């Protein structure tokens, strides 16, 4: 065991492509060391923090391999260079999702958290304007299309890490329960790890949900005096994370995700979906026929 060890691999995303589920599955395996909180954002927006802070985000237990799953890393422009400053050639796993479906799932998440009041079409129209002012809030919560520029994001990593190994997967394949073991075996093989057949792989983390009480949602997802007081009363990030996670889970009411009707979307976004899909297939050799509308 080495508590001060940097990751051997990263699952870079993408956002809304089962990264929370992968984190929970791999966290069952004692051979893996993962951060207690799935997304540390250390190599993206928290790069000003110390390495000691980063090491403290991990559960220091006996392990064979250390990794991090953080979908902000595929999107944040400086992350490849930030990683390179500390790690020469880590392995990268990227799980992609049909671009327009990913955008819609992101939109529903922002809406459920009280961050979005527009219709889906209007939100897409407003995206560039929202992102132009450099707002961290919009960068996180209104980046529906810009997070789907997969080809550009992959090429950025390949340029910085020409000697690293990459594994590309599709979210849609993982949705099929019968495929899950096959995909996980592929991940384990890629990481030179022995797959464990006793892992629970049947759950689905971070499902679509409504918040039962909006005032609780706003307390846990917005900056306010009570959150500041909570932070002062409980200095430990880990304990705050545990408490907040439990409150959020109790406040969630899982629902079946509303399926996106492509006929209601402006045609230019359908064209955008197809263009991004074709571009990705060329750079990653993925079969994206099912993504074309």
Briefly describe each language-model feature range.
Residues 1-293:
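Anion-recognition interface
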């Amino acid at each position: 065991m080495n508590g001060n060890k940097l990751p051997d691999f990263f699952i870079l995303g993408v956002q809304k492509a089962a990264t929370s589920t992968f984190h929970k599955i791999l966290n069952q395996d004692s051979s893996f060391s993962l951060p207690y909180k799935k997304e540390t954002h250390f190599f993206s927006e928290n790069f000003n923090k110390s390495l000691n802070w980063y090491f403290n985000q991990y559960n220091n237990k006996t392990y064979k391999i250390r990794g991090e799953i953080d979908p902000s890393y595929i999107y944040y422009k400086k992350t490849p260079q930030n990683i390179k400053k500390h790690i020469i050639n880590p392995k990268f796993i990227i799980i992609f999702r049909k671009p327009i479906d990913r955008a819609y799932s992101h939109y529903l998440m922002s809406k459920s958290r009280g961050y979005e009041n527009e219709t889906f079409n209007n939100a897409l129209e407003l995206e560039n304007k929202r992102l132009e002012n450099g707002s961290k809030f919009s960068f996180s919560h209104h980046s529906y299309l810009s997070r789907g520029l997969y080809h550009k994001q992959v090429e950025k990593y390949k340029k910085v890490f020409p000697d690293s190994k990459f594994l590309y997967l599709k979210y849609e394949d993982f949705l099929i329960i019968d495929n899950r073991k096959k995909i996980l075996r592929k991940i384990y093989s890629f990481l030179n790890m022995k797959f464990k057949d006793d892992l629970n792989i049947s759950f689905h983390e971070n499902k679509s949900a409504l918040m039962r009480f909006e005032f609780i949602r706003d307390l846990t997802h917005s900056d306010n005096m009570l959150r500041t007081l909570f932070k002062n009363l409980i200095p430990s990030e880990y304990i705050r994370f545990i408490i907040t996670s439990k409150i959020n889970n109790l406040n969630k009411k899982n629902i079946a995700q509303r399926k996106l009707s492509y006929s209601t979307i402006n045609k230019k976004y359908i064209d955008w979906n197809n263009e991004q899909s074709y571009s990705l297939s060329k750079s990653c050799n993925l079969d994206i026929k099912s993504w074309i509308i």
